[in-house]
């Protein structure tokens, strides 16, 4: 019986020197997505997916760990420079940007793209603890 000879094709990772880091930080979680300029996702990580559960997901340290994990995956694509788009009111915004900077990604610009209503929907009632 003849063996079929199969040529193995390795998937070539494309090189993306410039990328965009989208940091969405809510009151409960932080999501870091690194995309190319067209918006195609290269890597992403969340605080919850990084092993933090419950109230620890919303901490700045959890956001830092998520940003480091996303940066490690993005470095495999050859990312050197990132523009940072920050969205949301959460506590992990600053620490996620610092973590990207510490991973030898040059932060070229930081833009706040938090959506602000022009008096749209009624917000949730204030907490009484």
Curated annotation (Swiss-Prot):
<dbReference type="GO" id="GO:0019843">
    <property type="term" value="F:rRNA binding"/>
</dbReference>
<dbReference type="InterPro" id="IPR018102">
    <property type="entry name" value="Ribosomal_uS11_CS"/>
</dbReference>
<dbReference type="InterPro" id="IPR001971">
    <property type="entry name" value="Ribosomal_uS11"/>
</dbReference>
<comment type="function">
    <text>Located on the platform of the 30S subunit, it bridges several disparate RNA helices of the 16S rRNA. Forms part of the Shine-Dalgarno cleft in the 70S ribosome.</text>
</comment>
<keyword id="KW-0694">RNA-binding</keyword>
<dbReference type="Pfam" id="PF00411">
    <property type="entry name" value="Ribosomal_S11"/>
</dbReference>
<comment type="similarity">
    <text>Belongs to the universal ribosomal protein uS11 family.</text>
</comment>
<dbReference type="GO" id="GO:0005840">
    <property type="term" value="C:ribosome"/>
</dbReference>
<dbReference type="GO" id="GO:1990904">
    <property type="term" value="C:ribonucleoprotein complex"/>
</dbReference>
<keyword id="KW-0699">rRNA-binding</keyword>
<dbReference type="GO" id="GO:0003735">
    <property type="term" value="F:structural constituent of ribosome"/>
</dbReference>
<dbReference type="InterPro" id="IPR019981">
    <property type="entry name" value="Ribosomal_uS11_bac-type"/>
</dbReference>
<comment type="subunit">
    <text>Part of the 30S ribosomal subunit. Interacts with proteins S7 and S18. Binds to IF-3.</text>
</comment>
<protein>
    <recommendedName>
        <fullName>Small ribosomal subunit protein uS11</fullName>
    </recommendedName>
</protein>
<dbReference type="GO" id="GO:0006412">
    <property type="term" value="P:translation"/>
</dbReference>
<keyword id="KW-0687">Ribonucleoprotein</keyword>
<dbReference type="InterPro" id="IPR036967">
    <property type="entry name" value="Ribosomal_uS11_sf"/>
</dbReference>
<keyword id="KW-0689">Ribosomal protein</keyword>
